[in-house]
């Protein structure tokens, strides 16, 4: 099934509007999510229900706003999925944050700006599930951001050589 351009545009706009509907919130007191370890903070995202959640992914982005020059800056990190024992609910921990690292281009003096510097690594794309909160533990001093991903068209066949 192929979507017409207008249907693709409507689906894309709907996803953009729904992204703004997710909100941070409190956890259900009955579910024993662990307390944050020393030096970590717990973040909770409540996602809106979607008609096609099995084809939607959630991309997590962890970073901090820093004064940077014209080079490309980033942190290295890994997202590890854990499970609340006895409940089977997932939660995520960002660990092994290293850096920041940057390219080494010569920058004109006075070009520093304030920018969000994100961490890159494995595990940052997770399952979209509006039935459970998305619980993410990140190091203190860092910020959690997210966005959703959804396919805009069917797979295309690659012809054989």
Curated annotation (Swiss-Prot):
Recorded family membership: Belongs to the protease inhibitor I11 (ecotin) family.
Keywords in alphabetical order: Signal
GO MF, one example: serine-type endopeptidase inhibitor activity
PANTHER family documented for this protein: ECOTIN, PTHR35890
The UniProt record lists the keyword Chloroplast: no
Top-rank taxon, per record: Bacteria
Name this protein carries in UniProt: Putative ecotin-like protein
PROSITE patterns linked to this entry: PROKAR_LIPOPROTEIN
Residue spans crossing the bilayer: none
Pfam families in UniProt: Ecotin
Signal peptide: 1-24
